[in-house]
Amino acid sequence: GFFGRLASLCPRLEFLTARNGSVTARDGGVPLHSLYDPEREAGQGVAGKNPSRPSAVFFGFGLGYHAAAWSRLHPSGRLVLVEPDPARFFAALSVVDWTSVFSLKNLVIAVSCPVSSVLALIENSAVPGEAAFSGAWFLDLPRFTGHSDGYFSELRILAARNGEKDRINR
């Protein structure tokens, strides 16, 4: 069935049906999203984040519920999605409706990119007059990044350094 095809695409994840009927997943027993209502959890997780400057960078994004919720709240915002594992990205595309995400005019999806390239993509996608790093809200949840700890650890360090440069240069 459908879950079997998803499991063959991304064998590390266990796909299951949430109580509300949506698809959710676990990675090594850790739920990526709510086992009851992933959409509601995602909506609450992004509500009120950086409303004056709708710019966000997601380090990992699970199945995409948070990205979809954020893009519905900020349809003219800038969103950078970072995922080092292409299989996770394609599994997410198969599960969640990404229409609101792909409707964004300022969207960057960095899949399987070296960390240095991700930093450049974040910098180059900044809204003119806005600091690329210190002006953005970062979603960085261990359940979305645990599958690639080394990659995201390096990215966190370099992004923090660039955010500090943003603040100094302002």
Tell what function each PLM region has.
Residues G1-R170:
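N-terminal donor/sugar-recognition subdomains of glycan-related enzymes
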